[in-house]
């Protein structure tokens, strides 16, 4: 097995006996049973969120493609807890439709973050643009210690 990507594509077969196969074997996939993919909602339920600290604020970014503003909720709780949650509903099914493959995830997600003491919980701001949620939590300015010069006698 090579760790270097192949230049002319992957010649590996999609065999159920190949542990490194790209397409995982699912015996029910071709039979048309809905919801056989156990990870159907896991991709959405395990929404990844980046947390970056700048000198001025704590900034959280979450990729939430396809979600509308009203499907996302940002809340602050006591004890400096920031909660980001949302829900993507399944597409309504027409009884005449036959799904060939369902790869887009649906379901709920919720992530909670305990913020440090310097977080200004009353000034949290959130915005969503092009499917990316950005939550900004300003930080209190660090009080600089008073420095007193001492005269050196000689």
Curated annotation (Swiss-Prot):
InterPro entries: A-crystallin/Hsp20_dom, HSP20-like_chaperone, Small_HSP. It is found in: Cytoplasm. Disulfide bonds: none annotated. One of its GO terms (cellular component) is cytoplasm. Keywords: Cytoplasm, Stress response. Induction: By heat stress. It comes from the Eukaryota. Signal peptide: none annotated. CDD domains: ACD_ScHsp26_like (cd06472). Its main location: cytoplasm. Residues 40-154 form the sHSP domain. Belongs to the small heat shock protein (HSP20) family. This is 17.7 kDa class I heat shock protein.
């Amino acid at each position: 097995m090579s760790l270097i990507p192949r230049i002319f594509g992957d010649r590996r077969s999609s065999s159920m006996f190949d542990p490194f196969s790209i397409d995982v074997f699912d015996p029910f996939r071709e039979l048309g049973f809905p919801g056989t993919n156990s990870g159907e909602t896991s991709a959405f339920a395990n929404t990844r969120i980046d947390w970056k600290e700048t000198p001025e604020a704590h900034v959280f970014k979450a990729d939430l493609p396809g979600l509308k503003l009203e499907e996302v909720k940002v809340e602050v709780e006591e004890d400096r807890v920031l909660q980001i949650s949302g829900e993507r509903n399944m597409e309504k099914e027409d009884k005449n439709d036959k799904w060939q493959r369902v790869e887009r995830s649906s379901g709920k997600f919720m992530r909670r973050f305990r913020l440090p003491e310097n977080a200004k919980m009353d000034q949290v701001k959130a915005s969503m643009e092009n499917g990316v949620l950005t939550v900004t939590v300003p930080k209190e300015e660090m009080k600089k210690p008073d420095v007193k010069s001492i005269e050196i006698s000689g």
